[in-house]
A protein has these predicted regions:
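Short acidic (Asp/Glu) patches
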Residues: 55-64, 91, 95-101
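Secondary-structure boundary elements
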Residues: 85, 95-167, 175, 236, ...
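Hydrophobic/aromatic-rich core segments of domains that either
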Residues: 171-246
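Short, charged/polar, Gly/Pro-enriched secondary-structure boundary elements
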Residues: 84-85, 213
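Glycine-rich, small/acidic residue-mixed loop/short-helix segments
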Residues: 25-42, 220-239, 243, 247-250, ...
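Intrinsically disordered, low-complexity N-terminal segments that are enriched in acidic
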Residues: 1-84
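Short, surface-exposed linear segments at secondary-structure transitions and domain or protein termini
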Residues: 46-52, 97-103, 222-229
Length: 266
């Protein structure tokens, strides 16, 4: 088990004042099967009332409305997470994670990787467990990509990312999800925090014996106690940390993000 202190900040600057700003945030790590979260503090500017709910995937969602003109919107989340991957609690099985979503539908490039991964899985012992199988897929995804910030967008599909052989963590995760689901593994997308990334991170969890076990295709390794979960879903769209709409004329926006995670040793 690790005691991790986390701090996540996001600042959105507008080129002109905006009004009637409605937003939805999924930025709070919550206590779950592999982590206990305490001392969470959320700050939002401009200040406004927040409504907190839990979405259908179990992620914490905050919604708010800022009617007054403003040219900056920012929030920060701080807290402490006790993460223990050695004692992950069981969760109910959800069949929807067996099927691909809009961002993970395969095309020719992903289908070719599926064929390669099927050959790798066939070479495993007959009693290979899901995590062992997923590790083979993860390795194939890792080798296929060059990590290239700015090469994709939030709308890039698994097929599009793999076609250009470059992307970021969400692209690695989307391709791995697509392949896993086609070879019979139940898998879901995770958005969270990892020390040293400077921003949010994405990885994959595979369902095994009633528990979700994490694998990080960007780094080609199993998820350990250094990872903090924020949200999970079928793909990135279910885990977007911030979504909003506002009124304004010809407004441009610039986003700044910073995330830090460090272990606190007693």
């Amino acid at each position: 088990m690790k005691k991790l202190v986390f701090d996540y900040e996001m600042k959105l600057s507008f080129s002109a004042p905006v009004t009637d700003h409605r937003f939805q945030l999924r930025c709070i790590p919550a206590t779950g099967p592999r982590q206990q979260v305490i001392d969470v503090e959320v700050k939002i500017q401009p200040e406004t009332e927040l409504e907190t709910t839990i979405d259908s995937f179990g992620s914490v969602v905050m919604t708010g409305f800022i009617p007054e003109p403003h040219d900056i919107f920012s929030y920060s989340v701080t807290g402490i997470a006790f993460v223990d991957n050695a004692h992950i609690h069981k969760e109910a099985y959800k069949p929807l994670y067996r099927f691909n979503s809009a961002l993970t539908i395969p095309g020719p490039n992903v289908e070719a990787m599926i064929d390669v991964c099927r050959e790798r899985l066939a070479a495993l012992p007959s009693d290979a467990i899901p995590v062992q199988q997923a590790a083979e897929v993860m390795d194939e995804v890792y080798k296929a990509f060059v990590y290239t910030p700015g090469s994709t967008t939030i709308r890039t599909t698994a097929e599009q990312a793999l076609a250009q052989r470059k992307g970021v963590c969400q692209d690695y995760a989307h391709v791995m999800l697509s392949v896993c689901r086609h070879v019979g593994l139940t898998a879901r997308y995770i958005a969270g925090l990892l020390g040293g990334e400077g921003a949010t991170h994405a990885w994959v969890e595979v369902y095994q014996d009633g528990r979700w076990v994490g694998l990080d295709p960007t780094h080609n390794r199993l998820v350990d106690d250094s990872y903090i979960t924020i949200a999970h879903g079928r793909d990135y769209r279910d885990c977007m940390l911030d979504i909003g709409i506002f009124s304004g004329y010809n407004v441009q926006q610039t986003q700044w993000v910073n995330a830090s995670v460090h272990e606190q040793v007693a």
